[in-house]
């Protein structure tokens, strides 16, 4: 079989495949033979239909199309194997099938044009002496006090309040019912329209302004037990439930009980109750170490991300569609698994309407992921960065000890995953050693909100769908 190769854009190899007259004839005859043995034509037993009758009944075009399908499939498969092309994904036919049928004559040569995706070539214009900035995350001593105070609040004892009205920090037990406030000029005698889900009995709420929509908590402050009050509140705009965004509301609230928190002292006894440490000093030292490590880890991650972002500016690679689609598939699968573990119904979230949108929104990140992976692999090859079996074994052992409940583990696959992770880590460390990074204060390069938003586009889409498909609840109405 004569095969001519041609380099195409998007990391494709074009193939011009010339199929010999013998094969075009042989395939055609075999198709007729197969059809003759299976065709059900009145007046003839199967396998005994005369050739002219078979051709007349089935039609030459249908028979040629069946033979052509076999020629195309076998021809491309043999060409890829003959030329030892490391193809990825499914080959694509570049010739028009209609033109091939018109040109196909059994016993004469047939030329087929096809294309296959292959691993892309990575051109690293520069990968050493890179210059970039990264945000340095510093340990904040206040984190320790905040952590201890949070634990202290969790251990609070609720004591009934007597002789005073509600104030910020109290725990109130209320009945409430919410309605839409009347618009200006609306009939004062008309009944208020209830807000769906904005009704509760014996609802316990901590009087903290940031936990509910503006006006609700401040309206309760100053109330006495058994008192009923009409409270005006305003839904913020934007708001999770778009139907309520920016709308004014009226709540009829009855304060049934009022309690205050009695907080424990932060001492050695407190430390023993919330941890395995004997003294408060030991607990504080442990928290300092933990938050210091978290800060160092975040700084390290920032340096790695900044490095990879800078590296991609100096990489030239033409990605095949197959790799991009495979990465998009993997990303959506990971998102679905994560949402399923959170108890969400993935079938309701990943509808036929939203999947194409998610695929399109995931494409940019998928392309960046692939470029990163290919670039790091190329650096590893050029610099002969390797991982030893001993290093793999140590990491595998750590993982197995970390998850002892996992009984059915494919250790070969686990070792392969670990090898890739270690190789990536080593390559990034090598690049950092051969680059220059300037550490700048946290928050000085880009707002954290933008970073978090960029990382959760897909989750945001499916979460919005979940909101649209669910009934409103008390917390949806009242929480800000």
UniProtKB/Swiss-Prot annotation:
Name of the protein in its database record:
Trigger factor
This entry's Enzyme Commission designation comes to 5.2.1.8
Q: Which GO terms describe its molecular function?
A: peptidyl-prolyl cis-trans isomerase activity; protein folding chaperone; ribosome binding
Q: Where is this region: Disordered?
A: 441-480
The protein's gene is named tig
Show the catalytic activity: [protein]-peptidylproline (omega=180) = [protein]-peptidylproline (omega=0)
Return the similarity comment: Belongs to the FKBP-type PPIase family. Tig subfamily.
Q: What is known of its domains?
A: Consists of 3 domains; the N-terminus binds the ribosome, the middle domain has PPIase activity, while the C-terminus has intrinsic chaperone activity on its own.
Q: Name one GO biological process term.
A: cell division
A cellular component term from Gene Ontology for this protein is: cytoplasm
Q: Where is the composition biased (Polar residues)?
A: 462-480
Cite the PPIase FKBP-type domain residue spans from the record. 169-264
Give the UniProt subcellular location, in the record's own words.
Cytoplasm
Report keywords, A-Z.
Answer: Cell cycle, Cell division, Chaperone, Cytoplasm, Isomerase, Rotamase
This protein's source sits in the domain of life called Bacteria
- What pairs make up the disulfide bonds? none
Purpose: Involved in protein export. Acts as a chaperone by maintaining the newly synthesized protein in an open conformation. Functions as a peptidyl-prolyl cis-trans isomerase.
| Residues in coiled coil | none
**Pfam families according to UniProt:** FKBP_C, Trigger_C, Trigger_N
Q: Which SUPFAM superfamilies match?
A: FKBP-like, Triger factor/SurA peptide-binding domain-like, Trigger factor ribosome-binding domain
Predominant location: cytoplasm
- Locate the compositionally biased regions of type Acidic residues: 449-460
């Amino acid at each position: 079989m004569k095969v001519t190769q041609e380099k195409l854009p998007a990391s494709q190899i074009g193939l011009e495949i010339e199929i010999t007259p013998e094969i075009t004839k042989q395939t055609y005859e075999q198709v007729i033979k197969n059809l003759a043995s299976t065709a059900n034509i009145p007046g003839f037993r199967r396998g005994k239909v005369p050739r002219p009758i078979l051709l007349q009944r089935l039609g030459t075009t249908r028979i040629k199309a069946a033979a052509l399908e076999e020629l195309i499939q076998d021809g491309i498969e043999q060409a890829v194997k003959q030329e030892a092309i490391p193809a990825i994904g499914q080959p694509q036919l570049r010739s028009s099938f209609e033109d091939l049928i018109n040109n196909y004559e059994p016993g004469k040569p047939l030329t087929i044009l096809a294309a296959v995706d292959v691993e892309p070539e990575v051109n690293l214009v520069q990968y050493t002496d890179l210059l970039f900035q990264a945000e340095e995350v510093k340990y904040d001593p206040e984190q320790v006090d905040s952590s201890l105070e949070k634990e202290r609040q969790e251990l609070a004892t609720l004591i009934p309040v007597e002789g005073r009205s509600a104030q910020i920090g109290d725990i109130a037990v209320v009945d409430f019912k919410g309605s839409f406030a009347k618009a200006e000029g609306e009939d004062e005698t008309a009944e208020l329209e209830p807000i769906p889900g904005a009704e509760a009995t014996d609802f316990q709420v901590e009087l903290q302004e940031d936990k509910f929509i503006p006006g609700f908590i401040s309206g309760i402050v100053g109330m006495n037990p058994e008192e009923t009050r009409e409270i005006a509140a305003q839904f913020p705009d934007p708001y999770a439930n778009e139907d309520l965004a920016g709308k004014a509301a009226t709540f009829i609230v009855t304060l049934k009980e009022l309690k205050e928190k009695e907080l424990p002292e932060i001492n050695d006894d407190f430390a023993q109750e919330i941890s395995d440490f004997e003294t408060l000093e030991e607990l504080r030292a442990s928290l300092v170490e933990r938050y210091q490590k978290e800060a160092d880890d975040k700084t390290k991650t920032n340096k790695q991300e900044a490095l990879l972002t800078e590296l991609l500016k100096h990489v030239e690679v033409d990605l095949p569609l197959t790799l991009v689609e495979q990465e998009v598939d993997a990303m959506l699968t990971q998102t679905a698994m994560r949402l399923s573990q959170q108890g969400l119904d993935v079938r309701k979230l990943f509808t036929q309407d939203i999947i194409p949108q998610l695929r399109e929104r995931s494409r940019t990140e998928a392309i960046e992921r692939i470029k990163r992976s290919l670039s790091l692999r190329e650096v590893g090859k050029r610099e002969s960065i390797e991982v030893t079996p001993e290093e793999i074994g140590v990491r595998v052992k750590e993982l197995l000890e970390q998850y002892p409940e996992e009984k059915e583990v494919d250790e070969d696959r686990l070792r392969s995953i670990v090898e890739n992770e270690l190789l990536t880590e080593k390559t990034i460390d090598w690049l950092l050693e051969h680059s220059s990074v300037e550490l700048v204060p946290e928050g000085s390069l880009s707002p954290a909100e933008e970073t978090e938003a960029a990382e959760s586009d897909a989750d945001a889409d499916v979460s919005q769908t979940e909101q649209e498909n669910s009934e409103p609840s008390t917390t949806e109405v009242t929480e800000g």
